[in-house]
């Protein structure tokens, strides 16, 4: 899985978000290491929708937009399973690095 797909799914794991909120959450969680530019973000969301990992949903009740109608996205059960599998795969890599004493336990 592409790293930005994993980060997008992680951002959606707890609650529905619009594009800018996804971008901000990923940027903050990665300490600025990953910047999702609009083309990258919306291209990924379009493909992830086709794959069945996310769906577009309505804005939460009471959401105040500064204009326009932001698109909100929700992770699907399939998206959650795929994200969890990727997390397990990455955790195995971290465990291997720890066993080689490249990381502290």
Predicted regions and their residues:
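Residue-level recognition of specific faces of alpha-helices
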Residues: 8, 32, 44, 71-72, ...
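Amphipathic alpha-helical dimerization/coiled-coil segments
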Residues: 78-105
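N-terminal helix-turn-helix DNA-binding core of bacterial DNA-binding proteins
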Residues: 1-40
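Basic amphipathic alpha-helical segments that dock to polyanions
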Residues: 41-48
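Beta-hairpin "wing" of winged helix-turn-helix
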Residues: 49-66, 74
């Amino acid at each position: 899985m592409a790293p930005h797909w994993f980060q997008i799914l992680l951002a959606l794991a707890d609650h529905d978000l619009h594009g800018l909120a996804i971008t901000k959450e990923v940027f903050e969680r990665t300490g600025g290491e990953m910047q999702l530019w609009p083309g990258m973000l919306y291209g990924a969301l379009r493909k992830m929708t086709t794959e069945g990992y996310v769906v577009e949903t309505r804005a939460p009740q009471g959401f105040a937009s500064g204009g326009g109608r932001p698109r909100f996205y929700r992770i699907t059960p399939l998206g959650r399973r795929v994200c969890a599998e990727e997390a397990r795969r990455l955790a195995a890599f971290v465990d291997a690095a720890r066993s080689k004493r490249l990381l502290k336990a």
